[in-house]
Curated annotation (Swiss-Prot):
Entry cofactors: pyridoxal 5'-phosphate
Species annotation: Panicum miliaceum (Proso millet)
Pathway: Photosynthesis; C4 acid pathway; Amino-acid degradation; L-alanine degradation via transaminase pathway; pyruvate from L-alanine: step 1/1
CDD domains from the UniProt entry: AAT_like
Modified residues (N6-(pyridoxal phosphate)lysine): K299
Matching SUPFAM superfamilies: PLP-dependent transferases
Known tissue expression: Mesophyll and bundle sheath cells.
Keywords, in A-Z order: Aminotransferase, Pyridoxal phosphate, Transferase
Protein name as annotated: Alanine aminotransferase 2
UniProt-recorded Gene Ontology molecular function terms: L-alanine:2-oxoglutarate aminotransferase activity; pyridoxal phosphate binding
Length: 482
């Protein structure tokens, strides 16, 4: 009897879904890593450098001490009863852990919580949002999630009814959006960021793409904006954000604001403004604009990817719609408690006067300043190579250089049945051990080719990354020169 489950009879939405950040090149890199372990010296490099994903601690970034102290005490509350704890943990970490545990029934961090998250932790997150924006925030609007990704999936599940429902997404975009739209059976409506203007977002292009989609019978439900940008690293100007908010209001679109890199700003002339702050600043009240803001503990200076913490703040939805969002959250029971605690800490870190403040600020500033230096070093290195142009990384954790490939390289890629930038990235991996993501995994203007490279290798390894990359690129260009 034939197998009852085969690729041919799987859900076509799953087959359509792609996620390049952990795709073919990363799988090949993992095989090469195994080869290095079992056959040392068998490859032209001695380690794999994963520049494909925003996973800071996997590349050596250290966690923030205060956050980990509080998590340790919350996970093992009996430590709070021991006298020696006072000499091992800071006083404010001890008091914060006690305060957090007082909001958790039975101090049981291993128990399920309310489906939106523990109320006291949502109160803390709301207080952090209010402090950041200068406008009130309500714990009832907060849904704590296992990172930002489940929140995105929940909103796609809510908004997409069939393939005639569209979501406006930036190109290039983080593949979570194309993947989740495909999984839920919707249509991605692309709008292109302008590489020539530093990955600018033009309202005129948004209008054009919206009108074009509607003319084809697509009911465009929402606009996704990633700020700071992934994979492009730009930080939106405040006036641009005002135009985006007005556009969504005028066109009846839900604004899905991916703001997980809000702490990652590397230029003095830009700063992060949440879309909620912008909406309130232009005069839109609580009920005037449906807005979902996503935040995560995985990025910023904290980089706690494996803890799976995050939240979405939902405003501007009617009570009946909010009930449906809550129902989706309830199906998933709740997010993990460690991630919930960490989300509350990220939004309420130590303040001036707290015992941990000086050490916390030194850790935070050290990480962000180092990331800025790494971004500049890689940007300069890319721009000094033949056939590569790279915009400034204003924020986030990535550079997205354009690779101007020779015609012979494009023909060789076609013969290998690869996208040209995937062909380049695969050769880069096999020659140097450096893992990057082809731009074709994020979307790009047809006829252009890019790679996404994180700025996350530790600062003392950046010179080696640059040296390896330069040697490879020069040899590649010489091999395929027209």
């Amino acid at each position: 009897m034939a197998a009852t489950v085969a690729v041919e009879n799987l859900n076509p939405k799953v087959l359509k879904c792609e996620y390049a950040v952990r795709g073919e090149i990363v799988i090949h890199a993992q095989h090469l890593q195994q080869q290095l372990q079992t056959q040392p010296g068998s490859l032209p490099f001695d380690e794999i450098l994963y520049c494909n994903i925003g996973n800071p601690q996997s590349l050596g970034q250290q966690p923030v001490t205060f956050f980990r102290e509080v998590l340790a005490l919350c996970d093992h509350p009996c430590l709070l009863e021991k006298e020696e704890t006072k000499s091992l943990f800071s006083a404010d970490a001890i008091s914060r852990a006690k305060q957090i545990l007082s909001t958790i029934p039975g101090r049981a961090t291993g128990a399920y919580s309310h489906s939106q998250g523990i109320k006291g932790l949502r109160d803390a997150i709301a207080a952090g949002i209010a402090s950041r924006d200068g406008f009130p925030a309500n714990a009832d609007d907060i849904f704590v999630t296992d990172g930002a990704s489940p929140g995105v999936h929940m909103m796609m599940q809510l908004l997409i009814r069939n393939e005639k429902d569209g979501i406006l997404c930036p190109i290039p975009q983080y593949p979570l959006y194309s993947a989740s739209i495909a999984l839920h059976g919707g249509t991605l409506v692309p709008y292109y960021l302008d590489e020539k203007t530093g990955w600018g977002l033009e309202i005129s292009d948004l209008k054009k793409q919206l009108e074009d989609a509607r003319s084809k019978g697509i009911d465009v439900r929402a606009l996704v904006v990633i700020n700071p940008g992934n994979p492009t690293g730009q930080v939106l100007a405040e006036d641009n954000q005002c135009d985006i908010v007005r556009f969504c209001k005028n066109e009846g679109l839900v604004l899905l604001a991916d703001e997980v890199y809000q702490e990652n700003i590397y230029v003095d002339d830009k700063k992060f403004n949440s879309f909620k702050k912008i909406a309130r600043s232009v005069g839109y009240g609580e009920d005037d604009l449906p807005l979902v803001s996503f935040q995560s503990v995985s990025k910023g200076y904290y980089g706690e990817c494996g803890k799976r913490g995050g939240y979405m703040e939902i405003t501007g939805f009617s009570a009946p719609v909010r009930e449906q969002i809550y129902k989706i959250a309830s199906v998933n029971l709740c997010s993990n408690i460690t991630g919930q605690i960490l989300a509350s800490l990220v939004m309420n870190p130590p303040k001036v006067g707290d015992e941990s403040y000086a050490a916390y600020k030194a850790e935070k500033d050290g990480i962000l300043q180092s990331l800025a230096r790494r971004a500049k070093a890689l940007e300069d290195a890319f721009n000094n190579l033949e056939g590569i142009s790279c915009n400034k990384a204003e924020g986030a954790m990535y550079l997205f250089p354009q690779i101007h490939l020779p015609k012979k390289a494009i023909e060789a890629a076609k013969a290998a049945n690869k996208a040209p930038d995937a062909f380049y990235a695969l050769r880069l991996l096999e020659s140097t051990g450096i893992v990057v993501v082809p731009g074709s995994g994020f979307g790009q203007v047809p006829g252009t080719w890019h790679i996404r490279c994180t700025i996350l290798p530790q600062e003392d390894k950046i010179p080696a990354v640059i040296t390896r990359f330069k040697a490879f690129h020069e040899a590649f260009m010489a091999e395929y020169r027209d």
